[in-house]
Amino acid sequence: MTQQRRLNLVLELVSERGTVSIAEVGDALGVSTATVRRDLNLLAEQRLLTRTHGGASALGSGYELPLQYKIARQSEAKTAIARAVAELVAPGDAVALNGGTTTSEVARVLGSSEALGGGDAPGVTIVTNALNIAFELSVREHVKIVVTGGVPRRQSYELVGPLVASSLRDLSVDLAVLGVDGLSGRFGATTVHEGEAEASRHMAAVARRVVVAADSTKLGRSTFARICALEEVDLLVTDRPAEEAVAAELAAAGVEVVVAPA
């Protein structure tokens, strides 16, 4: 196991449990106590967790991990979701993508799609505020990239601020594919940063259809900043059926659900 993979797993454990001991991390990862101590100290130095006596704790519910530490989480689920989302895209479509690990995977699938890029296919237009998505797709001949204005956030590579809205004002897209940090009946689609929520909200406003791409860990939870009400979401693509209460909320809001098992 590489160090980066191990650090990702440590952060995932801390995020899920809130507080972990050195012994718990060692047992979960199958590594020595000395290795766990080094990893926890390194992550604490990077201000990604708080070191405690005999372990570590999460920084708080409002803290957002940088994108590079999220990539390994639910990776198989995100790949399955991305493939299902890509099936919704027809040649010639315009698609808005916000930032995040799930939408980045959607971008990769669209970028390698033979159905969209083969022969005389008209390709696809991607409108995004995510610098990593724009960079990755810029070499794809069948993809036209439109990047919004804005100020980049280091944690997510997303552009935020009033220039996002002004960039989108005169556009119209077939789909807005949104990655979220939470989806619930009461608060709708949410994310941890208000600037990213605003950018995603503007994307949804210029879309004929709003698609939320989210693994099952995001369902039934809410985070700091609201993107839109649940009723404004047309389709949810996820990896597992929602729990009964959440499924009822989705049905009441008229949200179509596509389950793409990993």
Task: Indicate residue ranges for each PLM-predicted region.
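HTH-adjacent hinge/linker in prokaryotic transcriptional regulators
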Residues: T2-A23, D27-T101, A107-I126, L131-I133, ...
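Short, Lys/Arg- and Gly-enriched loop/turn segments at beta-strand edges
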Residues: V106-A107, S222
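Conserved phosphate- and dinucleotide-binding cores of soluble alpha/beta proteins
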Residues: T2-G26, G30-A34, E45, A115, ...
